């Protein structure tokens, strides 16, 4: 997407949505095949940039209905496509419960994003129903989310100096590292900090506040993404601090022998797993219902 002075963020996203839907049409998907589409990534974190020097991609998760062939052969589409303004991940809607069960934040954030496309009112009500289970999902599977976020931070550490395809010039420009990876690690650390503190102070994890950045922390992370830090050594030290912090926050929710724990689940000193499946089962039932109605 090229930069055009005067366009609002919402206008950029609307333009990207049109391009994404056009790309879906080009690979054979009609409006009635779509369950819902949702923006994923920096747009949801309030860390997207639309300036002369830097224009953020608008990435999407797209969930579609299976066709009869998929049902008969037990196939579930899962592919990633590039389009004019970024990329979109195409997923069979039947995959949604298991993706959420893993508590990968890149899917959990879809339950909070305001940037949503549904082809009709029926699908909008379906998404509203799914989103209605998000707080229950957090309470039932918080340790899994913390472990997943720690894993994401470790991935950013491994990628900090790695010359992925198309990044060689960028890494050379910044003296041997990719500042975007550092930016992501800091964002993950902030999210884990917010989740941990809100849970231990109120008994409820505040995912939304940790997801959407504002004020000085937002300015700092955008500055690092665009301009980097003073040196490779400074970047590595800051990354190590992020990994250490994420590991510490994760340790509040996992024992040394890898058992999930939460302070509100201790009963007379006996171990009780805090991981519950009630919300996932409700989401699975909702998905089963809309898919069944599709073929009724």
What are these regions (language model features)?
Residues 1-21, 29, 262, 296:
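N-terminal regions immediately upstream of nucleotidyltransferase
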Residues 9-13, 89, 174-181:
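Aromatic-acidic/polar surface patches that form glycan- and anion
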Residues 16-28, 100, 246-249, 253:
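Hydrophobic, Leu/Ile/Phe/Ala-enriched alpha-helical segments that form helix-helix packing faces
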Residues 36-39, 109-110, 194-197:
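A structural signal for short, well-ordered beta-strand segments and their strand-loop junctions
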Residues 55, 59, 97, 132, ...:
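Extracellular structured ligand-interaction cores
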Residues 122-293:
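Conserved nucleotidyltransferase catalytic core and NTase-mimicking acidic/glycine-rich helix/loop elements
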């Amino acid at each position: 997407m090229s930069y055009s002075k005067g366009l609002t963020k919402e206008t950029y996203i609307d333009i990207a949505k049109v391009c994404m839907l056009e790309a879906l049409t080009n690979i054979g998907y009609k409006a009635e095949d779509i369950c819902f589409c949702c923006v994923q990534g920096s747009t949801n974190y309030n860390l997207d940039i639309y300036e002369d020097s830097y224009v953020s991609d608008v990435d999407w998760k797209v969930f579609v209905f299976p066709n009869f062939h998929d049902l008969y052969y037990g196939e579930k589409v899962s592919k990633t496509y590039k389009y004019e303004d970024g990329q979109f991940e195409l997923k069979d809607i039947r995959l949604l419960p298991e993706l959420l069960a893993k508590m990968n934040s890149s899917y959990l954030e879809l339950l909070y994003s305001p940037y949503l496309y549904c082809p009709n009112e029926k699908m909008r009500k379906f998404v509203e129903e799914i989103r209605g289970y998000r707080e229950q999902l957090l309470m039932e599977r918080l340790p899994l989310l913390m472990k997943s976020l720690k894993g994401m931070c470790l991935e950013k550490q491994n990628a900090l100096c790695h010359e992925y395809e198309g990044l060689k010039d960028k890494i050379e420009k910044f003296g041997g590292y990719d500042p975007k990876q550092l930016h992501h690690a800091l964002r993950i650390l902030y999210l884990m900090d917010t989740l941990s503190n809100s849970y231990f102070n109120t008994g409820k994890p505040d995912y939304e506040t940790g997801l959407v950045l504002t004020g000085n922390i937002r300015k700092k992370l955008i500055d690092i993404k665009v301009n980097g830090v003073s040196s490779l050594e400074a970047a590595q030290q800051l990354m190590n601090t992020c990994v250490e912090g994420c590991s510490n926050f994760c340790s509040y929710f996992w024992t040394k022998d890898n058992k999930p724990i939460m302070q509100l689940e201790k009963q007379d000193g006996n171990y009780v797993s805090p991981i519950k499946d009630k919300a996932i089962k409700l989401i699975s039932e909702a998905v089963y219902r809309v898919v069944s109605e599709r073929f009724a």
